[in-house]
Amino acid sequence: MEVQITNENFKTLRDGSLPLVVDFWATWCGPCRMIAPIISELANEYDGKIIVGKCDVEENEDLALEFGIRNIPTIIFFKNGDAIDKLVGAVSKAKLDEKFKAML
């Protein structure tokens, strides 16, 4: 299950006991729409093991600025409160799954 990441809930989710994957996206972004179903599938596959969130960069500009998001989609992987990896652009399910597995 995906959660909506906002300026208000990000720190709580990031600092929780489960790893966090955040997909920074926008409604007008074609590549973001391309990977959205993949992100949803992985969110379901890793439910209870990894929190998967989506952060609309237009609604949450503070977070986008904090992480220097210049291109979308950008996916940032957090573990123990720290950003440990990042992917930029539309990537394959296999590549994303590899990164998710590394989070466990």
Map each language-model feature to its residues.
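Proteins that catalyze or organize thiol-disulfide redox chemistry
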Residues: 1-51, 58-66, 70-74, 78-104
